[in-house]
Regions:
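Aromatic-rich carbohydrate-recognition surfaces in CAZymes
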Residues: 1-42, 72-73, 80-87
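Short, solvent-exposed segments of well-ordered alpha helices
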Residues: 24, 67, 166-167
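Conserved alpha/beta enzyme-core scaffolds, especially Rossmann-like or related mixed alpha/beta domains
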Residues: 26, 55-56, 94
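Flexible glycine/proline-rich, aromatic-decorated loop/lid segments
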Residues: 41-57
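Acidic/His metal-coordination segments adjacent to aromatic residues that form catalytic metal sites
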Residues: 53-68
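A conserved active-site cap/scaffold subdomain adjacent to cofactor or substrate pockets
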Residues: 72-96, 100, 116
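Active-site core of glycosidic bond-cleaving carbohydrate-active enzymes
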Residues: 81, 100-171
């Protein structure tokens, strides 16, 4: 949800050009939400030192607790990118307000360098054989679920009719 909120902030700023809102509210929100992504992921040797975010639930809540959900990783990267954009924009508009925010949030150059490293090295699952980006690391290993075999009265609220562990193992 953090990245979705950050995306809404950035979209609002892009559409309205409301620089005062950027200075008064948005920059701080974008920075703090970006920090979440820098805390929850890691550079994984097993993924060529790409930045991975594991044990997340993306927008497909029927596939919960997965590694490197494509949507989550993409939105996390964009959240961090938006935070860096906001800081640059704020500094160019009102350096005093920028300096106050940097002090308030205790932002250091090392943190921004780390964010840049994340942006440039975010991991996205890719299936070489099919030439597609699956929704997460394990998606292609899951068994296809033949929806035509689900009775109509059981299609809604799958968790009421099927155990979550059964649902999680399906495509």
């Amino acid at each position: 949800i953090n990245a979705d909120i950050a995306y809404a902030f950035k979209l609002y700023l892009d559409i309205t050009g409301d620089d005062q809102y950027l200075i008064d509210r948005a920059a701080e929100v974008l920075v703090e939400t970006a920090r979440v992504w820098a805390d929850v992921g890691c550079f994984a040797e097993c993924k060529d030192n790409k930045y991975c975010i594991c044990s997340v639930t993306g927008p497909d809540e029927y596939n919960a607790i997965v590694d490197n959900n494509f949507y989550t990783n993409l939105m996390a990267r964009e959240n961090i990118r938006s935070a860096m954009w906001a800081l640059d924009r704020m500094k160019s508009l009102d350096e005093d307000a920028y300096n106050k925010l940097v002090e308030k949030l205790e932002l250091e150059d090392e943190e921004l360098e780390y964010w840049e490293r994340i942006i440039n090295n975010m991991y996205f699952p890719f299936d070489e054989k099919l030439q597609i980006y699956p929704q997460d690391d394990g998606f292609m290993m899951r068994k296809p679920w033949d929806e035509s075999k689900i009775p109509e009265e059981k299609r809604h609220l799958l968790y009421e009719n099927y155990h979550p562990l059964f649902v999680y193992r399906q495509k």
